[in-house]
C-alpha cells in the first residue's frame, strides 16, 4: 500500500524538480524555494554533499505537508538506495537500471524509477518491478518515442 500511495503522490505532483547543489545548504535552500513556489515533487541528487542529511531535513520540514514528495536521484547502487530510503526518501531515481537497487526498493516498498535507453533495459527494469521508466538521457528522444514504445515494444 505504501508504494501505491507514493506513486499517487508522484502523479499528483505532476512535475518533479531535480535538485543539485554545491553544498548541503544550497540544496536545502533550492528545495525550499521550489516548494514555496508551488511545486510538490523534489528529487534530491546524490551529487549533493551530505545528500542523506538533506533528505532527512526535507522530510522533517515537510512532514506536515502530505502533498510534498521527496525522493533521491543519481542513485548508482543498492547501498546508496538503502541509505536514501533510511533517510526518508519516498522514491529512488537512477541514471541506469540496477537489479540490486530494484530488489532493495521492492523490499522497502519504495518506487524505483531507473533511467533506461534501450528497449532491453526497459523490459528488464519492468520485469524487476520498476514502477516508472525514465528515458535517459532524455535529449536523445523525440516526442513520439513514448507512444511508439508503448504501442510496439512494451505492451
Residue ranges and their predicted role:
Residues 20-22, 70-78, 94-97, 114-119, ...:
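Glycine-rich beta-to-alpha transition loops that act as phosphate-gripper elements at the mouths
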Residues 1-2, 117, 141-144:
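Short, conserved clusters of charged catalytic residues that mark active-site
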Residues 1-87, 107, 127:
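Conserved N-terminal beta1-alpha1 strand-loop-helix module at the mouth
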Residues 31, 55, 81, 102, ...:
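Generic structural signal for well-ordered alpha-helices
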Residues 98-100, 126-127, 131-155:
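Active-site/ligand-binding-proximal alpha/beta "capping" segment
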Residues 79-121, 125:
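Hydrophobic, well-structured mid-protein blocks that either form specific transmembrane helices
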